[in-house]
A protein has these predicted regions:
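Alpha/beta-hydrolase-fold serine-hydrolase catalytic core, especially in secreted/extracellular enzymes
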Residues: 31, 36-39, 155-156, 173-174, ...
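Serine-hydrolase catalytic machinery in alpha/beta-hydrolase-like enzymes
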Residues: 1-62
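A short, hydrophobic beta-strand element of the alpha/beta-hydrolase
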Residues: 94-96
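A conserved amphipathic alpha-helix that caps or lines the catalytic cleft of carbohydrate-
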Residues: 4-5, 84, 145
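The feature captures the conserved acid-bearing segment of alpha/beta-hydrolase catalytic domains
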Residues: 99-182
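Conserved hydrolase catalytic core segment
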Residues: 82-92
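Short helix-capping segments at alpha-helix termini
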Residues: 6-10, 62-63, 88-89, 113, ...
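Gly/Ala-rich beta-loop-alpha elbow adjacent to hydrolase catalytic centers
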Residues: 71-76, 80
């Protein structure tokens, strides 16, 4: 929170919620490479409904109709990009190291334009150099997502930032940078 305050002069309200079964709550569809649990991929719509029908109404009743940025790290970033293609409730997406390597993501993204006005993507510069054959595609997947977003949005309303390191490390800092970039974009 402190880093976010340092990175953006904008006032903000931050709301988070716990997902005990994060893969179940955030995966938009099943992928055995993420989990063999058959429940994975069945509950992202429930999570989105919670945000739209419970969380956002409470926030709006307390703070007014503020712009809403959705974001997260890893599967949270994937969920944010998916959610912002399913509803226009979000003005921006802060996707730090999103898990875009899942099976079927690029076909989905090509068929479903982002409904938010701006999007931040980031990736660690060593993430695509892992041994896992599925996950090592992440660099190409994020570059393709960025190209899609550049075609859909005003070019200045999307960015792809490369961070030093792999997937694990400085997750909070990377996520704060993503949200700050979005906040600075929508403040005007």
């Amino acid at each position: 929170m402190q880093m976010l305050q340092q990175l953006s002069p904008c006032g903000f309200v931050m709301a988070t919620f716990d997902t005990c079964e994060w893969a179940r709550a955030l995966m938009p569809w099943h992928d055995d490479a993420v989990s063999r649990d058959e429940e994975v991929g069945l509950h992202s719509r429930d999570t989105l409904c919670f945000i739209l029908n419970e969380l956002l109404p409470v926030l709006r009743s307390r703070y007014g109709n503020l712009p809403c940025i959705i974001g997260g790290y890893s599967l949270g970033g994937l969920f944010a990009l998916w959610a912002a293609r399913e509803t226009d409730a979000f003005c921006a997406v802060a996707a730090a190291s999103p898990s875009l390597w899942i099976e079927g993501w690029m076909l989905y993204a090509q068929a479903h334009p982002l409904l938010a006005k701006c999007a931040y993507l980031s990736l660690g510069d060593r993430e695509e150099h892992c041994r896992n054959q599925r996950m090592c595609r992440i660099g190409d997947c994020v570059r393709l997502e960025h190209e899609l977003l550049r075609m859909q949005l005003v070019e200045s309303n999307t960015t792809l930032q490369w961070n030093p390191g792999g997937h694990f490390g400085e997750e909070a800092e990377r996520t704060a940078k993503a949200f700050a970039w979005c906040m600075n974009r929508i403040k005007g």
